Every structure is written in C-alpha cells, then in structure tokens.
Amino acid sequence: MENAMETKHSNRARSRKGALRGAVLAGALMALVGCQTSPAATTSSNTGGTNMQLQLTQEWDKTFPLSAKVEHRKVTFANRYGITLAADLYLPKNRGGDRLPAIVIGGPFGAVKEQSSGLYAQTMAERGFVTLAFDPSYTGESGGQPRNVASPDINTEDFSAAVDFISLLPEVNRERIGVIGICGWGGMALNAVAVDKRVKAVVTSTMYDMTRVMSKGYNDSVTLEQRTRTLEQLGQQRWKDAESGTPAYQPPYNELKGGEAQFLVDYHDYYMTPRGYHPRAVNSGNAWTMTTPLSFMNMPILTYIKEISPRPILLIHGERAHSRYFSETAYAAAAEPKELLIVPGASHVDLYDRLDRIPFDRIAGFFDEHL
C-alpha cells in the first residue's frame, strides 16, 4: 500500500481549495467533532483547588482488541498546571533488557485514549516502541474542572507532561522520544514539539489546526463581521455562566438530522456506532462547553512551526479528507526536514482506525530512522 502513497517533499507542495465554504465561527467547533504507574482504581488530582478522585477503569474497554504482543498498564501523571492525566502505557512483550525508543500519542480532538490514539499506541508498541496514549486535561478519565473544556495552552502542555512521564520509565531511552498527534491534536503536537526540544521527531495524522478553524472557519471563510459577532455572543455566554455558577454546554455532537456534509456523516459513523463509540468521548454524543472556542480565537498554535527544524516532521493526510488543507499549509510553513504523505482515496476519519489506510509501516520506519 505504501508504495502507492503520494509523498510530497520541499518545492513540491500542491495547493488545494477546500469544498466547504461559509462556516460560521460559532459552529466551527461543532462541525469539527462530529505518570506514575498506579495499580489502584483511584488517584487524587488537585486541579485548581478542586480535589478530584480519578476513577480509572480496570477492565479492557477500548474500541479495539488487546494485542497478545504487548503489555498494557493504566498510569497517571501530572502536568505543569497540577492536573492529573490518565493514560494507557503499551510495552512490547519481547522487549528484552534494552532501553527502547518511546512515542507519546494524543487525539483526535474530542476523543479518548480508548479510541484512535490507543489503537496507534498499541500498533506502534507491536513494532518495538514504548508508547503512551493519554486523555487530555478535562476529558476522559483525566482530571480537571469543568469537564469537557479544551485549551491550546494546557493541551499543548499535556504532550510535554506525557514526555516527562515516559522519559523516566526504566524501559525507555529518554534521548529517543517521538510524538504522534491525530486530528486536532496534530496541531497541538506540532506546537508542543516546537517548544519541547527533548522530542526528536513528530508525526501528525489527519491533522487539524484547531486555532485556525475556530478563529477563521473552514477554509478561512469567516468574515471579520462574523468573527466579531461570535466573540460578542461568547462574551454574553460568559456572563450567563458566571451568573449560574456552572458552564453551559453545546448540543450533543454527531447526532445526525439529515442533510449534513459527508465529513459529518463520517464522524457519526466513527463516534456513534460500535466502530468507535466510547461513552467518555466528547464526540460520542457529549459536548464541549459553550465557551471552549474562546481560548482558540487569538492563539495561533503553528506560529513557531519552523522551530521544529532540524528535527523531522511527517504529515499524513487522506486524499479525500475535507481537512487536507491543514496539513498542506503546515507543510508549506515548516522548515526542512519535512514530508507530506497523502494516502490515496482516504477520508479524514479513515485515518482514525482503518488499518488498511493508516501507513503504519511508514510511521514505524520514520521513527526507526529518526529516534
């Protein structure tokens, strides 16, 4: 399959106009979704003065079967803001006594570690890497209040906190750390790696730049008037939340009413069917807070993408993905060494879990070469 991939290197980037126009800013988020080892079931998390107990499941509740080739552990670790994150650690069973390269994995935006990131983590562990799939702050089994809120700053920090944790494991060579970001966490991964020089290589799969789509809409179609109106509405919502003492939430995601764009149908097919449904996922019929877009509106996370160089970037996207332009723009903005790999015929969601579409051989080869 990988010989059929369309790979783009410097001076060969191809621009592509998106088919989606006129997305209003307030709807951009809704359109998108459509560690210390702890054997105990709970662990304390001090999150902004709120002492939470993380309720960690002990049964296998992933959307994919457990591989006989890996060892799995539930773990927790704290980020720099004192939020305790829950994660799944995967180790190759035939690892021997050598310290191994490691990969930290996050995403998609609104998903949990039991979904796509866990599948990537387990598959890469089968190929000889120690891997960690984590729930971002405020979501899944991780700590933080209020629930289901996102932040480009805190969620970027989540990646570096995961690097902190995995680097201290006795099975890991801390000089050989990589990162994979999926969907909206692809942009977060690039932002984290730009500032975190401990990471030696980064891969994004079916990437979104969440700050771009929330501030400008799909294909940058939002006007200044629309943006201003949205910010005014979000400001009014802040007053309502302050008056009630609790945040309001958007309508449940990925419930189809008919007439939706194909990519929204694709989201539903993953998040709301047995294929990928998970009750803790924001995208599986839950929702983000109404004011979640605020922190994304004026904080462009790819500003310093050039500073990832001289460490290599591999950007992977589906040929038919509505989001393809995010990877193409990131590729154009990044410095060498960089590679854009287009998967023929693949949609955005295909790269969440379709083993016949995700180029795991290429991903493993990339990290084998650069870690």
Swiss-Prot record:
GO molecular function: hydrolase activity
SUPFAM superfamilies: alpha/beta-Hydrolases
Family matches, as Gene3D superfamilies: 1.10.10.800, alpha/beta hydrolase
One Pfam entry name: RMMBL
Alphabetical list of InterPro entries matching this protein: AB_hydrolase_fold, Polyketide_trans_af380, RMMBL, Xaa-Pro-like_dom
Top-level taxon of origin: Bacteria
Entry's transmembrane regions: none
PANTHER family: SUPERFAMILY HYDROLASE, PUTATIVE (AFU_ORTHOLOGUE AFUA_2G16580)-RELATED (PTHR47751:SF1)
Family indicated by similarity: To E.coli YcjY.
Name by which UniProt lists this protein: Uncharacterized protein PA2218
Taxonomic placement: Bacteria, Pseudomonadati, Pseudomonadota, Gammaproteobacteria, Pseudomonadales
